[in-house]
Amino acid sequence: MVKPIIAPSILASDFANLGCECHRVINSGAEWLHIDVMDGHFVPNITLGQPIVTSLRRAVPRSQEEEKASGEVARPTAFFDCHMMVEEPEKWVADFAKAGADQFTFHYEATKDPLSLVKLIKENGIKAACAIKPGTPVDVLFELAPYLDMALVMTVEPGFGGQKFMPDMMPKVEALRTKFPHMNIQVDGGLGKETIGVAAKAGANVIVAGTSVFTASDPHEVISFMKEEVRKELKAKHILGDETKH
């Protein structure tokens, strides 16, 4: 069983006020933060590295239990979903696990041995996910999926935010949902109120949304709308899980 998850992409946030921006979207209903890591090689853009994740983890702890143990005033908590658009992702696993990542999403196209990489990620105590670019066929994930915590179908070309959603990627989502009904399936790129219905109907339950959330005058309304669209489709497919569990 799966539940609706909205993961605002911090690539669309005001980096001068990153901690406050993250608190704002978490307080608006987001449980995950999507952290895009780009190296300028696998994709042409360069974004951020593990020092930012380390700093952000201090501002956004994993859980209230962790907060209570520290004795500090409770702050918003979130799951850190690190999307690694990098060459040789293997060499970054330990650093990002130490920095505070909860999930390490590598690109299928960036590694020669995806199964060994999944094992390495899990040995470092975090969740493992695999992403595919728009030009990569979905069936490359079928053998790997039983070992994954999540699959990511890119709905734009990776590397830059603010691109238009590619609806022709939805058959990939449908194929994954049919074969793996209880798996987290994420879509990333161009998601907002206008496109969420198509993605939800295809079977996506983890929605990366950047500009549509961070630039909204009312991010709570946007997040709530998208969650409800996903919830309706998961319920119709009889795979809606308990949303009180984290």
Curated annotation (Swiss-Prot):
The EC designation for this entry is 5.1.3.1
Report residues binding a divalent metal cation.
34, 36, 83, 188
Q: Name one GO biological process term.
A: carbohydrate metabolic process
Q: Which cofactors must be present for this protein to function?
A: Co(2+); Fe(2+); Mn(2+); Zn(2+)
Q: Which CDD domains match?
A: RPE
Q: Please give the family membership noted in the entry.
A: Belongs to the ribulose-phosphate 3-epimerase family.
Q: What is the lineage of its organism?
A: Eukaryota, Fungi, Dikarya, Ascomycota, Saccharomycotina
What reaction does this enzyme carry out catalytically? D-ribulose 5-phosphate = D-xylulose 5-phosphate
Record note on cofactor: Binds 1 divalent metal cation per subunit. Active with Co(2+), Fe(2+), Mn(2+) and Zn(2+).
Protein name in UniProt: Ribulose-phosphate 3-epimerase
Keyword Isomerase: yes or no?
Answer: yes
* Functional summary from the UniProt entry: Catalyzes the reversible epimerization of D-ribulose 5-phosphate to D-xylulose 5-phosphate.
Q: In which pathway does it act?
A: Carbohydrate degradation; pentose phosphate pathway; D-xylulose 5-phosphate from D-ribulose 5-phosphate (non-oxidative stage): step 1/1
**One term of GO molecular function:** metal ion binding
Q: Which UniProt keywords apply?
A: Carbohydrate metabolism, Cobalt, Iron, Isomerase, Manganese, Metal-binding, Zinc
Organism for this UniProt entry: Candida glabrata (strain ATCC 2001 / BCRC 20586 / JCM 3761 / NBRC 0622 / NRRL Y-65 / CBS 138) (Yeast)
Annotated residues that bind substrate are located at: 9, 83, 159-162, 188-190, 210-212
- Which residues participate directly in catalysis? 36 (proton acceptor), 188 (proton donor)
